[in-house]
């Protein structure tokens, strides 16, 4: 049973009509259960704080822990809401302000200067005193999608904040779908209801149509006199009105339904309608609620608040079918509605006990129970930060056991063991040393030299350097890294600075794996690639201002790709040189050909290894290796030289081939849609102890590079590919025609849909099927939503077809045409248009377009 933290007030007994669809089920469900007594009148004082203590629960126990994130479109009020949460929980003594640069979670100089969140910040507070909330404030800008993705990976629940004026925006939909991939339960908080043009009812209907869920309206906005200023909320769960007093928002006056009937009759009726709709909706998805409804004589208002909270929680945790989305209201900047939102976090969102990681669970339920008993902790490194004072900090989420200070940590991805000399509990930019990080919690390990984002870390009992099977191969689901589409050159001020530049870049890449660094072999130029222009600008600021690198970043350009137009001749190359004072010799044969992931030819049956990554496919063929599997399940080959096992054999060839594919033969851009077949003949290509992993890797690189060059000299050549973006544009009805015409004619794009749900792409983490994709769309007219103060028509009426009606355009547009598009969109839409975009695919360019791009890249020559 979930402890109810919402305050209750006395309510009238009103008998509305029964459930429309559940009368026939009465006998089957057994309606003769005893009634649960209602709340007594006068149980609570008029003015008090909204949070109460749950004395039966001990502090920081796992079932009272919440790992939550704040997700939303940029400028929806994420950081503002977070600052109020910290203030009301007692963590801070004053409310931070985004405009003043005084917030706790936005502590980077670039964040305070720009007034946006760039880096997700973790902070722990208590609400009420016995419940621990580990909160992560995430960025809203599309350029920092990876920062959101790696935060979502370790969350148990999330609060999605919507702007009550703008409604459901494009980036909101995108992050919502990413959260759906990880099946994260979410509640929605409609913010900024104090602003002119705010429309709570319209936003609720947009949630049903654009976020593909059933809105469960738990609160309705309280406008003074029905259409005056926003002063509080009507609580449909506890049947009361909450009115915030002016000031810091700590003083709240509560009104029961009887009092509201006299002072605000319109609000009282709306609360009753909201409660009726809430019980009806829950009854359609939760059989227990049907039983409770009949136990209370089919009286919607008589169902106790605890039962409604329990039902909401059960519906939130359902994995199958369409989700119910609890809706709350407020205006964080005016200090209205944040405390009930905190109550909803602890009441409705799950604890770590209810969301175990699937990979860890499958291993701990395996047959090797003797090994499992030695597992002391299992954690995922989801973020790495280089702190000027504390050194490298690795943020971890502990999924099992307790991570203790000075324990040996085995990295199952890198196969290395490190010590954890210091453990920290982070409070944004401040830290407190702790002796351990318990299961279900988020903390920081300081002093790790090798751990990266996405690595799995395990500690185990015993003195062995590596843990026993299967712990040594346990890997939690990694964090997917989207492909970069912009790049810029990095030039050191002098040759003496070059080494430090590369050390600083290595730190940047460890912090942010969505950045990529490549070095041009011919010119020696270093290129930094990222997700967007702002992403690279922030990386430049971090490199130069924070890491004190003496370098200059060149102009930001688009990252094109190169693809083969046909098959290359068969090429064999031998590598015979000394590597670090040791002789190395190996050979390899390579063939390069086009590769279409959607229509790929069959893979040879004798293929030793097939790996498809970043649009390329690498096939390794070695039919004479005589590969066998031993009793431990490890592949062996008697033909391989001593000291070379099958795993390192495959990895060496694969890495060498990848190094060659990073640079195309004609335009020097990375290869894409390319299949490489590497063939190894043991009698011709392996030379005993001289064939080391480094020699094999070099041979594969030489053979692949030669095959790519032969595409130009004696083959069909290569073509340029450009990134095509999936663009979602939010505008009003009046601007629709101009924007559609601009996209389809001036920018060479094509319109995919108008006002439809965003299609998932590879960069939206669509690794698993969405649970709602086959369900019919929800009709917004059938969704309960309170009438907005200036809305005409009945409750739930569809939006009027006016010039201000919000519209959404989904289009496919070449990235080159989208550079600097925001300024142009604002001019077309009178300043109201916004857009987000993600990489959809790379597409082969036409000859005239390729010629124009090359001329531009060469400076007009």
Swiss-Prot record:
InterPro entries: EF-G-like_DII (IPR053905), EFG2 (IPR030851), EFG_II (IPR041095), EFG_III (IPR009022), EFG_III/V (IPR035647), EFG_V (IPR035649), EFG_V-like (IPR000640), G_TR_CS (IPR031157). Pfam families: EF-G_D2, EFG_C, EFG_III, GTP_EFTU. Residues 63-353 form the tr-type G domain. Coiled coil: none annotated. PROSITE patterns: G_TR_1, G_TR_2. It is found in: Mitochondrion. It comes from the Eukaryota. Keywords: GTP-binding, Mitochondrion, Nucleotide-binding, Protein biosynthesis, Transit peptide. Residues 1-17 form a transit peptide. GO terms for biological process: mitochondrial genome maintenance; mitochondrial translation; regulation of mitochondrial membrane potential; ribosome disassembly. GO terms for molecular function: GTP binding; GTPase activity. Gene3D superfamilies: 3.30.230.10, 3.30.70.240, Elongation Factor G (Translational Gtpase), domain 3, P-loop containing nucleotide triphosphate hydrolases, Translation factors. Signal peptide: none annotated. The keyword GTP-binding applies. GTP binds at residues 72-79, 137-141, 191-194. Belongs to the TRAFAC class translation factor GTPase superfamily. Classic translation factor GTPase family. EF-G/EF-2 subfamily. Mitochondrial GTPase that mediates the disassembly of ribosomes from messenger RNA at the termination of mitochondrial protein biosynthesis. Not involved in the GTP-dependent ribosomal translocation step during translation elongation. This is Ribosome-releasing factor 2, mitochondrial. It comes from Aspergillus niger (strain ATCC MYA-4892 / CBS 513.88 / FGSC A1513). The lineage of its organism: Eukaryota, Fungi, Dikarya, Ascomycota, Pezizomycotina.
